[in-house]
Structure formats: structure tokens, C-alpha cells
Curated annotation (Swiss-Prot):
Enzyme Commission no: 1.1.1.50
Metal-binding among keywords: no
Location of this chain's protein in the cell: Cytoplasm
Protein name: 3-alpha-hydroxysteroid dehydrogenase
Similarity comment: Belongs to the aldo/keto reductase family.
Free-text activity regulation comment from the record: Potently inhibited by the nonsteroidal anti-inflammatory drugs (NSAID).
Site (Lowers pKa of active site Tyr): K84
Amino acid sequence: MDSISLRVALNDGNFIPVLGFGTTVPEKVAKDEVIKATKIAIDNGFRHFDSAYLYEVEEEVGQAIRSKIEDGTVKREDIFYTSKLWSTFHRPELVRTCLEKTLKSTQLDYVDLYIIHFPMALQPGDIFFPRDEHGKLLFETVDICDTWEAMEKCKDAGLAKSIGVSNFNCRQLERILNKPGLKYKPVCNQVECHLYLNQSKMLDYCKSKDIILVSYCTLGSSRDKTWVDQKSPVLLDDPVLCAIAKKYKQTPALVALRYQLQRGVVPLIRSFNAKRIKELTQVFEFQLASEDMKALDGLNRNFRYNNAKYFDDHPNHPFTDE
């Protein structure tokens, strides 16, 4: 594990770069910053880009990728682009529609990975979070196995090279894996995963099923007031993490990132700062000793920054199993 260009095999024979660049945008950041950050990331060796229909920045990310293809920095096949099916498109007949919207926005012919963003379905329409007159989210009952069959058809049509899931618990993954007539297993489960929520059980489960665990909020969170409790702990200020970082003469962010790579997790990072983006590529220049990995394991407190409270009361809420 010595290079940002390294890829690991997925269970369908495709390969995913071991380090990804996330494209969610906090409210305070202008969308054109996404174009700039994506180009900087490509120039610094990033090839794996994670986005979603929900993020409303796919046009900008696509523009940045295409400009770096046009100037000869990369070829399309060098880039691994992930997008996500939003909850208002879970009906089987709507799955391809959502993916086609992504392809139109990015102006790409296919996505490398298409994943179900959440296991919870919402009523279809143009609004991301449809609500009734009392402000209650309008849930929809769609069998996740039916949604998965439509995802399989997107892969067969060549619109998505690989398909996976996000924010699923083990029980929900089992439903798909045990589905009669299953054609393709999910290649990944993308979940919140960091030192305070190390997802050791989910990681063991995914490894046992040949499913890659992809982590978001890898370095904690951006403290975005729209979804993060401002009283929540600041991960990168953790004294144990900072002491280990000092020992290796690295930043706490690099140690938190290296921890995930050594566990076999594919971490996503996000930054709009050119210096920070370049710094994070140095994660391949050192290795953590086993005693330090154990010390970092000990920081787990099963703490979520993203508790998906907006989906509270949904019968398929994944975190109610915990």
C-alpha cells in the first residue's frame, strides 16, 4: 500500500482506488470551489471521486473531470466515479431515471460505481425530502430487493460498472445477499466510519462477504451546522490521536486516514484547501505499528456525527438495530 494509484479488487472483478475524494459541499462553500478542488485533487493523484444526486454538485464535478481529460492529465478509464441513488427514486421503474440524471449532469457515459444512498424510500417527486402539511416526511414502502434488481439492470445496461449500497446495516445487507435470483452482490457498503465509530463488526461482516467497506466522515466531520451537533467531539483534537501523530511526525488527519487504510477500509476525504489535499496524499509514506493501531482501536465510542435524524421513524432506518 505505497501509492495513491493503488486499487483493490471488488467482488465483480472491477477495481476501486484505495483512497477517495468526497464532493459534498457545506452551505458556506460556493459550488465553483468544487470544480477547483476536484481539479487540484486530480493534479495531486486522486482518481476516485465520490458524489451523489443529492449533493447537487455533479455538474461541477463532471466539468472538472472532463477538463482534466481534455488537457491530457487523465483518461476517462483512469477515473473512478461514484454516484448514489436518492431515496425518492427507489421504485424499480425510477432507478434508471435517477442514474440517467447523473449521467446527464456529469456528461459521463457511465459511472464506475452506483450505490443506494440509504435503505429508506421516500415518496417520488422533485423534492429531496417530501413532507406533508405537518412537516412529516412522506415515507414510501418499496422492497429493497426490488430496488436492487433495478440496480442490476443498470449494470447490465453498461450505465454502471459496479453497484453497491450505503448506510445499510448487516440485516439489510443480508436481505439482498439472500435474495432469490441474486445476479450481483453489492461490491461495497459506504458508511460513516472513523476513530470514534470504527465499525469493527460491520467491517468483519463485509470482509466475510467479500464486500468493501468505504468510509465517510473519515476525519470526523466538517462541523456543518445543518447536520452536525456543534457540541459533538472534534476527532482531530483527540489527545491519543495527537500523541501518536507526534510520535510519527505526521498530522492527526494523516494518522486517522492511515488507520483506515491499514484496516482494509477504502476511506473518503474531502477538502477545499490545496495544501491540505496535497498533504493527505502523504498517507502512503508511513505505516502505523500494531501497538498504535490497537491504541487507535481503543478510541471507539460508537459515536455518530451523521445519525440520519431526518429519517427518524422510518421503518427501514438502519441505525435502529444498534
